[in-house]
Regions:
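Mid-to-C-terminal alpha-helical segments outside catalytic/metal-binding sites
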Residues: 4, 103-139
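Conserved beta-strand positions in the central sheet of alpha/beta enzyme cores
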Residues: 13, 36, 58-59, 82
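Active-site metal-binding loops of divalent metal-dependent hydrolases
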Residues: 16, 39, 61-62, 87
């Protein structure tokens, strides 16, 4: 899959739960312009590699309640962040068993704007711009 993405100049979205260090090393072997670590669950130790390689990371509703993820987000530049919901999943931690869907995106962006000390409007524009760059990089 990575070889095909490299040859076709396609972006890739990678779910690397519990294997992030290994996956980063594998991805670095390819010349793929846009890599997204979807549902990023890495820590501060992984962030340097993410930043050095201009990889994107995305965060979902876990950003609303996970202190570890909030701490991690503080170290990632806004220009490398995307948001998502990856549903349907049940988030009993903060939404009383509501299934995730795009209606949660404004809450995620609001939380991100609070963490980054930026206006909601600025963060929305940046997330939109990041998304366009990620998807259209090869065009």
């Amino acid at each position: 899959m990575l070889e095909y993405a490299e040859k076709q100049c396609l972006p890739v979205s990678i779910h690397s739960r519990n294997s992030l260090s290994d996956v980063i090393e594998i991805v670095k072997e390819y010349d793929i312009k846009n890599v997204l670590f979807h549902w990023f669950d890495g820590d501060v130790n992984h962030i340097k590699q993410i930043i050095d390689n201009n990889y994107y990371v995305s965060f979902g509703p876990v950003l609303l309640y996970s202190k570890r993820i909030i701490k991690t987000v503080n170290h990632i530049p806004l220009n490398l962040i995307l948001v998502e919901t990856d549903g349907p999943l049940n988030y009993s931690n903060c939404f009383k068993s509501v299934l995730s869907s795009p209606f949660l995106l404004p809450s995620i962006i609001f939380r991100l704007s609070y963490i980054k000390h930026k206006s909601f409007h600025i963060v929305c524009e940046k997330i939109f711009s990041n998304t366009i760059k990620y998807v259209n990089h090869s065009f």
